[in-house]
Amino acid sequence: MTAVPAHDHHTLQDFIERHQRLFVLTGAGCSTDSGIPDYRDLQGGWKRPQPVTFQAFMGELSTRQRYWARSLVGWPRFGLAQPNATHHALAALEARGQLEVLLTQNVDRLHQAAGSQAVIDLHGRLDVVRCMGCERRMPRTEFQVLLEQANPGWAALEAAQAPDGDADLDDVAFEHFVVPPCPVCGGVLKPNVVFFGENVPRARVERAFAHLQAADAVLVVGSSLMVYSGFRFVQTAARNGLPIAALNFGRTRADELLTLKVEQSCAQALAFLHAPPHLPRARSVNDASARSA
């Protein structure tokens, strides 16, 4: 397929209204209007140092100290984030009966908060903490209490919000930060998300591919697709001949595979989903001029 440059959200509206079983794949660009920063620039490069790897988190106490210190400071704001117009528009798409599944690379659960039900959290969820020893789960809010009790004064630190529910703590020493162990077995506690270098659970991937098999088109919203765990679904869709549209500012890894690309605000481009389906579109000045020419 060849990427089609498009700047008019009506083209995207036509694409969506032509399909009834959309496989929607979302990324960080969906949540920026909720106050959660994204990761990449318009060229798909990193805006900040790369996220922690699974191997470093599990193998180095210093990495866990730094991760959980930043998370202690950033979690309260992240946990209070609310769904924005993009999340609500995609929930409306499901209510119209046009959604096969919504596969999100985000870990913020804002799609569910907006009312979406057919959601697969590809990379897990940040509001749950998992013991890597006994597999016990606990709410992130519960672990926040343990972190603050073990590290008095840290919650009062001020820092800019970062993408992973953490905060940009500069010039802070972490060597005395206390990371609470699992209260049951004493094991290492980790957010229940897929880190870089960690595999997405196979059953989750297979479930997503089953939905892709049943879909009649793919819609990418707010993702550069630079991470292979998300890109592979678009790659497979292209191989199977499915039409693919992307709504994203800047370059995506799949540009050469796209049927349609729209570089606009996600919320603005999807605003039509809040209206009842199949209503005639309002005529623009350009439409009227074209008809009278």
UniProtKB/Swiss-Prot annotation:
Keywords: Cytoplasm, Metal-binding, NAD, Transferase, Zinc. It is found in: Cytoplasm. The active site is at residue 123. Its EC number is 2.3.1.286. Pfam families: SIR2. Zn(2+) binds at residues 131, 134, 182, 185. SUPFAM superfamilies: DHS-like NAD/FAD-binding domain (SSF52467). It comes from Xanthomonas axonopodis pv. citri (strain 306). NAD-dependent protein deacetylase which modulates the activities of several enzymes which are inactive in their acetylated form. This is NAD-dependent protein deacetylase. NAD(+) binds at residues 27-47, 105-108, 222-224, 248-250, 266. The gene is cobB. One of its GO terms (cellular component) is cytoplasm. PROSITE patterns: SIRTUIN. Belongs to the sirtuin family. Class II subfamily. GO terms for molecular function: histone deacetylase activity, NAD-dependent; NAD+ binding; zinc ion binding. It is an enzyme of class 2 (transferase). Its cofactor is Zn(2+). Residues 5-282 form the Deacetylase sirtuin-type domain. Binds 1 zinc ion per subunit. It catalyses: N(6)-acetyl-L-lysyl-[protein] + NAD(+) + H2O = 2''-O-acetyl-ADP-D-ribose + nicotinamide + L-lysyl-[protein].
